[in-house]
């Protein structure tokens, strides 16, 4: 019996749910990245670092809902903050104390944020940051790096758009040259310091510093998309790399499991949104902007994510990446392990992975078999081979992941498994 057959036997309720959901939702869901064959498991509840599916299978979760839940599921301090705000109201037609509290925290925590505004997602944060860069510079084009994912806005989602200039990640000379040639047209360079969707690939520090130098020289607004990478240091990847961008976009974990995004940066750029002296240069309406329940959840989450907590996560991440390499090496499976801090990526390739171009060589079929095999062993990873740690995960849980991976690789390497592939 192969991995998929075992998965089908373990998740029949999810299979039935999926067939019913497809009658009402295209693909059975509203989030494309969650699909994998034969059907995605339907998760029913979570507690700490564990989730349960509809069939009652208990799994150790190494996704944190794709890096959002940095403290795991239902952390008491976070749920208490949510309940307190719910008792006061879910939304209001005016500013709230919750908004000021989280704004004050973020401005004090992240060096590049002189002023900040809130949105409902990282996608919206990127959209507003780019709108500001265009208005501030009077230019239209946006440059981004190969492999960077910045949400689902039309002009940055793909790699081909009339307003988009695509730069090679990792090649500082070529990227700077392309910026220089279009210097009169490029408003912003959008950078994901750790490229999450590409496979948790941290960009080279020298390359990032070169991009900071080039954008400063050319008058291009440097925008760091820290939706995923905020967790790698107390002040985000920008603190880790020692780079101060002009603007920063946030999302995912800053809502503590509820929808929230934020963007901010230099005072003179953010002043374009200020309506207190007349009509703002850039309007920023939104009925759910700065929702107080999300803000309360986010503040509780970030207050728990102290420097000490981040350091502990990063130490565990360093150890996990080293041990993952060891397990694959012992099994004779070629692998490149990427990541930074509490983020990790597994690439089934015999070449070093420094950019997305290296990552495309990964064996996708083998990766899927490992994913299903780990699910059958009670371990939940992202089907794309990436994962994150949470403060709810300890050394014992890391060992459980490593032991499960050893069993899966041993099964995949057996003659019977090869015949059932």
Map each language-model feature to its residues.
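Conserved N-terminal phosphate-binding loop of PLP-dependent enzymes in the Aspartate aminotransferase
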Residues: 1-421
